[in-house]
Amino acid sequence: MAYLGKKNKPAILPMQIAYFTGLRLGEVCGLAWQDINLDEQYLTVRRSVRYNGARHKTEIGPTKRKKVRTVDFGDTLTKILRKAKKEQHRQRLQCGQLYHLNYYREVTEKNRVYYELYHLDGTAEIPEDYTEISLVCLRPDGAYESPSTIGIVCRTIKNRLPGFENFHFHALRHTYTSNLLANGAQPKDVQELLGHSDISITMNVYAHADREAKRNSAKLLDKVVGSD
């Protein structure tokens, strides 16, 4: 995480959340503070953020399976989230009126409803059809962190950091799956945590992650005890 530096620092929290909960990228970006119970240590996955290329808009809406699910987490993520919340409060005070708040608005086009995501600073006049949403993953100025921006950071890690040539955001979800199953979690429970439609998807992810781990171990052994 230290490699990301100041410029890409906003991408750290989304990655940490994904690592400890297995959420998809869009689900992480759509997570709001009211979805998180820090005392009871669980979060509720209600929505997802995505960029609609056809409309050239960032939208917020239902998750992939259009189902709400609950995911428990432990002390480590609790500390991370408490620290992030405190830091966001500090940044809001520091920025004053220049701090951005996030909003969505309902738009109907061709008999289809969309929820567009926007951010405005404190000097802007807020349209009547805007509804504020307190998202968790933010930039220092309070604007929401988008999946596309995080994707760029992931590609930077992949291209520039040795040993991470196969890294992508979804790998964090795979790691979460693999860690749970390898430590005795029931496949059905893991399926529900991940929001998979079929348990075979869960097991295929685990099998793939297990193969990757063995492949990487073999390469490491080649380097350590190679014949050269």
Model-derived regions, located:
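Catalytic-site neighborhood detector that most strongly recognizes the C-terminal catalytic loop/helix
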Residues: 49, 175, 194-220
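Basic, Lys/Arg- and aromatic-enriched nucleic-acid-binding interface segment
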Residues: 1-31, 38-39, 67-68, 91, ...
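Active-site/catalytic core of tyrosine-dependent DNA strand-transfer enzymes
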Residues: 74-164
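Short, polar N-cap/turn motifs at the start of nucleic acid-interacting alpha helices
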Residues: 35-42, 185-205
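Short, contiguous acidic/charged loop-to-helix segments that flank catalytic cores in large enzymes
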Residues: 3-8, 59-68, 138-147, 160-171, ...
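C-terminal secondary-structure termini that scaffold catalytic or DNA-interacting sites
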Residues: 40, 51-53, 58-77, 82-83, ...
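C-terminal catalytic core of tyrosine-transesterase DNA break-rejoin enzymes
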Residues: 16, 20-27, 149-156, 160, ...
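Hydrophobic, well-ordered secondary-structure elements that form the walls
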Residues: 45, 73, 137, 154, ...
